[in-house]
Amino acid sequence: MCLYRRCFGQEKPAAPIDNRNRIIEKMGFFSLFSRNKTVEQADAEKADLERGLDKTKESVLKKITRAVAGKSSIDEEVLDNLEEVLVTSDVGVETTLEIIERIQERVKRDKYLGTAELNKVLREEICALLVESPQEDPWQQEGKTPYVIMVVGVNGVGKTTTIGKLAYKFKQSGAKVVLGAADTFRAAAVEQLQEWGRRTEVPVVAQAMGSDPASVAFDTLKSAVAKEADVVIIDTAGRLHNKIGLMNELTKIKNVMKKVVPEAPHEILLVLDASTGQNAIEQARQFTAATEVNALALTKLDGTAKGGVAIGISHQFNIPIKYIGVGEKISDLQLFNKISFVESLFGE
C-alpha cells in the first residue's frame, strides 16, 4: 500500500458512485457567452483548450503508461502507482485519496475492469468530483442588475488581465459593463485596468493612487446604476501579508457596495495562477478564510505541466471553476466545462 494511504488511512467509505456514467455523458455548457457560438468557434475553443493543456497531458499520460506497464488488471500495485502519478501531477493528496477510493469501489463493483479501462474510469471519477458550475446567465437573472463581481487574488496571478478578458466576453454577449479600479495600492494596477478599458471600450471608474478602495467600489456601482449597466467587475488589491487586514478590507468593500446594490457582490471570483501548483491551493485556503469565495478562475494553464491543480482546488474547497486562461489572446479566457477539461487532460 502506498505511503499516502498508509498515513491517511483508507477505511473511509467511498463516495456514492450512482449516476457516474450519466454525469460523464452530460454535456451541459454555460449558456453565457455560448448562446450564439458557431460550430467553428466551439471547435476553435476546444483546440485552444487542448493546446493549453498539452504540457500537463503529456506529463500525466506518460506517468500513467508507466504505472500500468506490464499489467492487465487494476491491482494494488497499479493503484499505488496511479496514486503517485496524481500526487506528483499537483492534484493534491486529499483529492488523490478520494479518486483512488472511488476507483477501488469501481473495481470491486465491476469485477472485470482491467488496465485498458483505467483511463476511462479515471476520467469518469475525476469528472464526478469536480464541482458543477452554474448554467444560467447571471446578469440576466431578475433582480440582479447590475450583476456585481468582486475579483480577488494575489498580485502576479493575472487578475487584472482576467478582468479585462472577462469584460470583453460579457460585452461580446451583449452586456453593458463597468469596471472599478479598487486596487489603489499599485499605480500599475489602475493603469493596466484603464488600458483594458480602452481596448474593450468599457468604462473604468478610478480614483487617485492610495484612495480608499471601498470609495472606488461605491463610485463604480453608482456609475453603473446611472448607466443602467448589466455587469460590474471590481478589481481589488492582492495582498496576503496580513489576513486580518485583507478580511477587513474586503468586508468594508462589500458593505459599502451593499449601500448601492443590496445584494452585491453577487459573485466573489478568486483568480489563481495554475503554474504555481500547490501554492495556488494555499492561496485558495487563505482567501476562502478571508471572504466568501464562490467562483474560481485559473490562469496560465497553457504554460505549465501543473494543470492537475484545478482538480484538487475545486474538490478540496467545493468551489466551481468558472473560467480558465489557456493563452495570451483576448479570447483565450474560456468558460470552464469539466467534461471538456477532463477529456482534454486525460483523453487518449
Tell what function each PLM region has.
Residues 94, 127, 132-348:
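P-loop/Walker A NTP-binding module and the surrounding RecA-like catalytic core of P-loop NTPases
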Residues 1-138, 142-151, 172, 176-178, ...:
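Non-catalytic terminal/linker segments enriched in charged/polar, low-complexity residues
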